[in-house]
């Protein structure tokens, strides 16, 4: 018989209360706690933080102390009063002024992903995403559901921008891409990977190919100082002619779709691709036995509740890519969240 002191019960409680940890993080970001502390000339007490974020002193104190335990804040006591400031972690990832800020990603996950995950049991029963149950939006056209308002589309694109601000370099240097001077980022949204390509491979040019509403949002809300090297082109990669390129980048694209749609897209790329050209697939790869990594398994469940796809093993991607005609399959586990696959025509 287990007891409240055994390791199994403690682990169960850690899992059970995991959603509370996420909500502490989401709430502190939404309230602007980390931004307020970043802008302050020194550590702030509870009263100053509560006033700055327009919240109750009682609730603010509870939130701040929990953030300390989560190593998101640090605290010092002076004359019996607690003063709080950001840690290196929160300064790097949870303040809007940081170049590696993840604030928009957390905002998106806290409002959209978290809502869909509340219907995980329904998603498992039905085998489909939960936009209709969560937001009342039909998901027959997946990205009409994902981009269900201008605000949601911008939030999603800002989240992608932040993902690649941290993860772009590791996947774009997994292989030497200097032999591909003309690149096309299919579904490249805000152009974050395109900019990283220019930084890593001087002299290359990148076309960002995405649906018209995404391209319009990108032009309105994201800066493109490298206008001659980055071209934004409107189109649907499932049906419109694809831009000419030496390398096509599919970053977090294939995991959105079932195998049939993936095969259709890959065949379209193959027929457009020049001999010797290739595809760089960027995804979080499951181990071959599908028993891990845990984060990738969770991402695969996220694909269930939010998309039509799943995360896959290297062998699964090999099957999809080789069936479309590609050869010279290589994959590399980067040690970061996302991995890379390179194939050629």
Swiss-Prot record:
S-S bridge residues: none
Keywords: Lipid metabolism, Melatonin biosynthesis, Methyltransferase, S-adenosyl-L-methionine, Transferase
UniProt-annotated binding residues for S-adenosyl-L-methionine: 147, 164, 210, 235-237, 252
Matches recorded under Gene3D superfamilies: Vaccinia Virus protein VP39 (3.40.50.150), Winged helix-like DNA-binding domain superfamily/Winged helix DNA-binding domain (1.10.10.10)
Enzyme class: transferase
Pfam family for this entry, one: Dimerisation
Swiss-Prot/TrEMBL induction comment: No night/day variations.
GO MF annotations in UniProt: acetylserotonin O-methyltransferase activity; protein dimerization activity
Known EC number: 2.1.1.4
Assembly with partners or alone: Homodimer.
Entry similarity comment: Belongs to the class I-like SAM-binding methyltransferase superfamily. Cation-independent O-methyltransferase family.
Biological role stated in the UniProt entry: Catalyzes the transfer of a methyl group onto N-acetylserotonin, producing melatonin (N-acetyl-5-methoxytryptamine).
Record protein name field: Acetylserotonin O-methyltransferase
Species for this entry: Macaca mulatta
Gene it is expressed from: ASMT
